[in-house]
Every structure is written in C-alpha cells, then in structure tokens.
Amino acid sequence: MKSRWIAASAAACALALLVVPWMLRPGAASKSPGTPAGAHKSEGAANLDLTLKDMNGNAVRLADYKGKVILLNVWATWCGPCELEIPELVETYAKYKDQGVVVLGISLDDTAEMLRDYAPKKQMNYPILLMQDDFDEAYGPIFGVPVTFFIGRDGTISRRHFGPVSREQVDREIKALL
C-alpha cells in the first residue's frame, strides 16, 4: 500500500514538472481557455477604444493618448510588489512626461474612495483608472498583478511584463519606444 502511494506521488510530481513549465511559457497567460490563438496577444495592436473611469468618476478614453508612449500598469492597493513599484512609476512619469510619455495606473481595487485616500499618500502623480470587465476583453485576462503594458505611439503593444518592473527595465522599454 505504501509503495503505491509513493508511486502515485512520484507520478504526480513528474506530471507537475511537465505541466507547470508549459503553463508558464511566454504568452500562455495571455490566452484564456476557449480563446482563439492570438486573440489576446501580449504584443501587437493595443485596443485604445477602451473607456475607463478615473478616481473621480470621469470617463477617460485610452484613444486620447494615441500618439504618446503609454505605460499601462495594472495594480492594486493590497499588492505588495505593486506598492514597491509605485515610486518607480512616479519617477518615470516625472522624467518622461515632457517627452510624450504617459503612465496610467489601472487599479483592481473595488472603490474609488479607497484610491482617493491611497494615491495622495503614495504621491502618485499619474492618472489612476478603475478596472472594468471590458479591459480583459481588450488586453487579455489579468491573472496576477502587477502587469505592465508598454504601448508605442502607433498604438502597438511592444511588451507585456508580468510582475514588478525595475527602473532599468522601464527606462530601456521607454527609450526603445521614443
């Protein structure tokens, strides 16, 4: 009986060693089950026809930023890595805004009230927008945060970065798009 349990455990571990890397391959998270290949591309044309609400309830059209380099950062107040990258994003926006770069924070938080209290405490100098269901349709499902999209002036996603971004990564991506 014990040897069967050991054999079953070994088989499960071997299967996990094969399946997990396959699931974590680049581009795997950009597709949801039942979605045709390429429907949620990590690179390619961004859907700028999306309208989201800001912390004050105002509608913000992403199309209004066409012609600018867009750093689109999906985050949440309860996310530790997101909180750590906020100073990087604040500095990035201050450094590049006069060169036609905009940083947009897309928050997964439930209420705008939460953000109106949080953003000033973190000295967030860039627009904060609220996540809506149609974001997933436009950019693919978000399975974890932070996720950062780098979008060129022509509206093309040049990179989708999962996890926190460093200052060096942001500078490299933005300079390539300027």
Segments predicted by a language model, with ranges:
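Conserved redox-active cysteine motifs that mediate thiol-disulfide chemistry
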Residues: K66, V74-E91
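Conserved hydrophobic/aromatic "anchor" residues
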Residues: L50, Y65, V74-W75, Y118, ...
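N-terminal targeting signals for export/organelle localization
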Residues: M1-D49
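Thiol/disulfide oxidoreductase modules built on the thioredoxin-like
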Residues: D117-N125, L130-L177
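Hydrophobic beta-strand core positions in alpha/beta domains
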Residues: L71-N73, G105, F149-F150
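Structural microenvironment flanking redox-active thiols in thiol-disulfide oxidoreductases
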Residues: E83-K122, M131-A138
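A short beta-strand-turn-helix
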Residues: S42-G44, D49-I70, Y93-Y96, Y139
